[in-house]
Amino acid sequence: MLQGYSSVVQALLGTFFTWAMTAAGAALVFIFSSGQRRILDGSLGFAAGVMLAASYWSLLAPAVEMATSSGGFGAFAFFPVAVGFTLGAAFVYLADLLMPHLGATEDPQTALALNLDPALMKKSDPRDPTSLLFPESELSIRIGSTGLLSDKRENGEVYQRKKVAATDLAEGVAPSGSMHGSSGQPGGSSWRRIALLILAITIHNIPEGLAVGVGFGAVEKTASATFESARNLAIGIGIQNFPEGLAVSLPLRGAGFSTWKAFWYGQLSGMVEPLAGVFGAFAVVLAEPILPYALAFAAGAMVYVVMDDIIPEAQISGNGKLASWASILGFVVMMSLDVGLG
């Protein structure tokens, strides 16, 4: 993120930084055990606050200013921002709905690696070997918008998206040690599971990469769309990606993957961001009138991910107060970066 280069190069540098932060978070799998849930919940809460602040000061505020200064909307200057914001949220929501049709719910071992439900584990029966696959302290993680664990209500009843039922565990899951050979390598059908995992993570990271690319593509289009603002957005997304890398690698390690393989797939979750960032920068450079829509689209996608995934995940394991105060701290830190250094 160096001044004096084109917006596309800036976007590439910015998203390489966010990818590096994902890898740094995933590398913590070499240090932390899979039972240290408080650390992850606090980090996720902090990331949620950072992303909410970045969505407004680095994306929505420039979008509103561009729509207002264009003069083409008059009293309806809010319209392109509202449309873009709604479309961004809808993009993540629809991508989430498509995951079951791509086979993400058909293989229980995929869910087992990423969804270790504390409620199910607390009710484990010592007489049932399938209930003792993982200790109660094991992590229960979702991967962004397409994650495998989500406490929500549908028609008044709590359900968990893409949840592994107890019958799935009994019928289709072997103990974690049998998933891999003695060298920690995945079994014969694991490459399909890995492909589904990468697909889920990729869908989640596209909006973040787009946000960085659009942010750099919008530089100097309005007074609030500055290089500093785009740089701060990349820093904020990098901060958010740090616990995300850990949220991928730690459950995989607990599910029986070797430490190096857990790290590899954890850092892989950020690989799509440079591609999405370059695409976003190219799009706004070539079609400047779409800038308000593009900025608001990125903001809507990120806010939806925060509200639908990061905040519920941070609250689900009994560390809600810690996560909430960490969110406040993250918001203040990102606001200070944008206002003080923007």
Curated annotation (Swiss-Prot):
Induction: Transcriptionally up-regulated by zinc. Up-regulated during lactation. Keywords: Cell membrane, Cytoplasm, Golgi apparatus, Ion transport, Membrane, Nucleus, Transmembrane, Transmembrane helix, Transport, Zinc, Zinc transport. Pfam families: Zip (PF02535). The keyword Lyase does not apply. It comes from the Eukaryota. Its main location: membrane. GO terms for biological process: zinc ion import across plasma membrane. Highly expressed in the testes and portions of the digestive system including the stomach, ileum and cecum. In contrast, expressed at very low levels in liver, duodenum, jejunum, and colon. One of its GO terms (molecular function) is copper ion transmembrane transporter activity. It catalyses: Zn(2+)(in) = Zn(2+)(out); Cu(2+)(in) = Cu(2+)(out). InterPro entries: ZIP (IPR003689). It is a multi-pass membrane protein. It is found in: Cell membrane; Nucleus; Cytoplasm; Golgi apparatus. GO terms for cellular component: cytoplasm; Golgi apparatus; nucleus; plasma membrane. The chain crosses the membrane at residues 12-32, 44-64, 72-92, 194-214, 263-285, 290-307, 322-342. Belongs to the ZIP transporter (TC 2.A.5) family. Zinc importer that regulates cytosolic zinc concentration either via zinc influx from the extracellular compartment or efflux from intracellular organelles such as Golgi apparatus. May transport copper ions as well. The transport mechanism remains to be elucidated. This is Zinc transporter ZIP11. It comes from Mus musculus (Mouse). The gene is Slc39a11.
